[in-house]
């Protein structure tokens, strides 16, 4: 089940948003932010205000996902419904690594093994829009705990080292214009 679509349906189609808010003036922005928070790529036809709130919610969701993944991995919970047997020795598929090298999100349909899903979790970092989001992800420490995992598979460990370098490089790239400047007229 697509939890974002269901959340938007429950709140707006079933009317439960009124359990939380009496005023409907922001319904279109809130609905879009909920509906789009888990998509691979945001819709093109968003208004600047919708895009802002979608990006904020998406960043917050990714930061929370890092926490959840650390918790589940420490408890050996099978969050990705893949084979955990000997996961420290599993390979990282070429298609997943190609997306990581591009600093992109990994498409769900390309993930097959635990290590593919793990790399997909690391690549969420590349999709964080705002500098403060990256800062929070690092300050909270969950993303760093994910980065600290080491594989016993020599090829996978080389690829993980490459991803760690890509993360460091992403932190030194020029950041986009800050939110206050970008959306000051909204």
Question: Where do the PLM segments sit?
Answer:
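Generic alpha-helical structural context detector
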Residues: 9, 32-35, 55-58
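Short, well-structured alpha-helical segments
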Residues: 24-38
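Divalent metal-dependent phosphate-bond-processing catalytic cores, especially two-metal-ion Mg2+/Mn2+ enzymes
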Residues: 16-18, 39-186
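An active-site-proximal "capping" alpha-helix that borders the catalytic cofactor pocket
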Residues: 2-16
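Active-site metal-coordination segments of metallo-dependent hydrolases
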Residues: 1-6, 24, 53
């Amino acid at each position: 089940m697509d939890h974002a679509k269901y959340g938007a349906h429950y709140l707006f189609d079933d009317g439960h948003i009124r359990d939380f808010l009496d005023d409907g003036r922001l319904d279109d922005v809130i609905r879009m932010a909920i509906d789009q928070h888990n998509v691979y790529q945001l819709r093109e036809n968003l208004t600047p205000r919708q895009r802002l709130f979608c990006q904020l919610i998406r960043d917050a969701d990714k930061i929370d996902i890092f926490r959840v993944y650390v918790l589940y991995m420490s408890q050996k919970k099978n969050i990705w419904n893949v084979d955990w047997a000997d996961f420290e020795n599993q390979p990282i598929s070429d298609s997943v690594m190609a997306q990581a090298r591009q600093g992109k999100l990994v498409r769900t349909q390309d993930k097959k093994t635990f290590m593919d899903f793990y790399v997909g979790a690391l690549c969420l970092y590349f999709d964080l829009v705002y500098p403060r989001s990256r800062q929070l992800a690092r300050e909270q420490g969950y993303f760093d705990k994910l980065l600290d995992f080491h594989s016993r598979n020599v090829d996978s460990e080389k690829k993980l080292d490459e991803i760690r370098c890509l993360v460091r490089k992403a932190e030194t790239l020029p950041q986009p214009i800050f939110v206050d400047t970008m959306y000051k007229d909204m």
